[in-house]
C-alpha cells in the first residue's frame, strides 16, 4: 500500500502537490500536452501504486447500432504512480462534462473492461446511480479507493466504469469472482462507506446480464 494513499478523503490533499492543469476540450483529454508531459522525467520522487491502471474511453460518436458491443472502447493512458494518476485526472473531462452515451473506465492494467476478458468473465458488478451531473466527486473517490488499495478484498476488484446517460449517471465497480459472496458483500459495504452513499446498491453477475440483459436481478444487496 502507498503511504500517500491512506483513504479516499485524504488523497485530495495530494492533488495540490501534483496538479499540472492545462485547459482545452476534446472528448476526454482536455490538453494535447497531457500525454507528452507524462513522458518527461520528473525530478521529484514518484510514489508507486501497488498495481498499474489503465483509463479506457468508449466514444459515443464512434458507436453504431451494427457495431459489436465494446468495439469502440480504446485505452487512453496507463499509470502506475500517484503523481501520474493526478496528472492524467487533472487533464481529462470529469463525468459531468462528458457527452451523453459516453463510458469511461479505469481498470487494472492488462484487464479489458469487457465481459469477455478472462479475468472479468466469472465476475459481476456493484452499481450506484446519480442524477445527471452529480457523480464527479463519487467517481473520483471510487478511483482513489481502488488505486489506493483501500478495499479489504482489493484483489477481487477489476476496475470501475462511469456511464453517462440522458437522465442519470451510473458508477459500476467490477469484480472477478461473483460467486464469492463474502468478498463481494465486503466490497459493496466498504464502497458505500467510502462514498457516504446511503441508498441500497445491488450486485449483478455478468453471466446473468449476458443472458437476461436488463431483466437480470441483483444477487446481493447492501
Swiss-Prot record:
Annotated segments matching region Disordered: 1-37
Full protein name: Eukaryotic translation initiation factor 4E-1
Entries under InterPro entries matching the protein: TIF_eIF4e-like (IPR023398), TIF_eIF_4E (IPR001040), TIF_eIF_4E_CS (IPR019770)
Keywords assigned: Cytoplasm, Disulfide bond, Initiation factor, Nucleus, Plant defense, Protein biosynthesis, RNA-binding, Translation regulation
Transmembrane regions: none
Acidic residues composition-biased segments: 23-33
Residues that bind mRNA: 65-70, 97, 115-116, 165-170, 210-214
Disulfide partners: 120-158
Similarity remark: Belongs to the eukaryotic initiation factor 4E family.
Effect of loss of the gene: Plants lacking both eIF4E and eIFiso4E are semi-dwarf and exhibit an overall reduction in polyribosome loading.
GO cellular component: cytoplasm; eukaryotic translation initiation factor 4F complex; nucleus
Its job: Component of the protein complex eIF4F, which is involved in the recognition of the mRNA cap, ATP-dependent unwinding of 5'-terminal secondary structure and recruitment of mRNA to the ribosome. Recognizes and binds the 7-methylguanosine-containing mRNA cap during an early step in the initiation of protein synthesis and facilitates ribosome binding by inducing the unwinding of the mRNAs secondary structures. Key component of recessive resistance to potyviruses. (Microbial infection) Susceptibility host factor required for viral infection (e.g. potato virus Y (PVY) and pepper mottle virus (PepMoV)) by recruiting viral RNAs to the host ribosomal complex via an interaction with viral genome-linked protein (VPg).
Biological processes per GO annotation: defense response to virus; regulation of translation; translational initiation
Subunit structure: EIF4F is a multi-subunit complex, the composition of which varies with external and internal environmental conditions. It is composed of at least EIF4A, EIF4E and EIF4G. EIF4E is also known to interact with other partners. In higher plants two isoforms of EIF4F have been identified, named isoform EIF4F and isoform EIF(iso)4F. Isoform EIF4F has subunits p220 and p26, whereas isoform EIF(iso)4F has subunits p82 and p28.
Tissue: Expressed ubiquitously in seedlings, roots, leaves, sepals, petals, anthers and dehisced pollen, with highest levels in pollen, maturing anthers and roots. Strongly expressed in susceptible plants but not in resistant ones.
Modification after translation (UniProt): According to the redox status, the Cys-120-Cys-158 disulfide bridge may have a role in regulating protein function by affecting its ability to bind capped mRNA.
Amino acid at each position: 500500500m502507498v503511504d500517500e494513499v491512506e483513504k479516499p478523503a485524504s488523497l485530495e490533499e495530494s492533488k495540490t502537490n501534483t496538479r499540472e492543469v492545462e485547459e482545452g476540450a476534446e472528448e476526454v483529454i482536455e490538453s494535447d500536452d497531457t500525454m507528452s508531459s507524462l513522458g518527461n522525467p520528473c525530478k521529484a520522487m514518484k510514489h508507486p501504486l501497488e498495481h498499474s491502471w489503465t483509463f479506457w474511453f468508449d466514444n459515443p460518436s464512434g458507436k453504431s447500432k451494427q457495431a459489436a458491443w465494446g468495439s469502440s472502447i480504446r485505452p487512453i493512458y496507463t499509470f502506475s504512480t500517484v503523481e501520474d494518476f493526478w496528472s492524467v485526472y487533472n487533464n481529462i473531462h470529469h463525468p459531468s462534462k462528458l457527452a451523453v452515451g459516453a463510458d469511461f473506465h479505469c481498470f487494472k492494467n492488462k484487464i479489458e473492461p469487457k465481459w469477455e476478458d478472462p479475468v472479468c468473465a466469472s465476475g459481476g458488478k456493484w452499481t450506484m446511480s446519480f442524477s445527471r451531473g452529480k457523480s464527479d466527486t463519487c467517481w473520483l473517490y471510487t478511483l482513489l479507493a481502488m488505486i489506493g488499495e483501500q478495499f479489504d478484498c482489493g484483489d477481487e476488484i477489476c476496475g470501475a466504469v462511469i456511464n453517462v446517460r440522458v437522465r442519470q449517471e451510473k458508477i459500476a465497480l467490477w469484480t472477478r469472482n461473483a460467486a464469492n459472496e463474502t468478498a463481494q458483500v465486503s466490497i459493496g459495504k466498504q464502497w458505500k462507506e467510502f462514498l457516504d452513499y446511503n441508498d441500497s446498491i445491488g450486485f449483478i453477475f455478468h453471466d446473468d446480464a449476458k443472458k437476461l440483459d436488463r431483466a437480470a436481478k441483483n444477487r446481493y444487496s447492501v
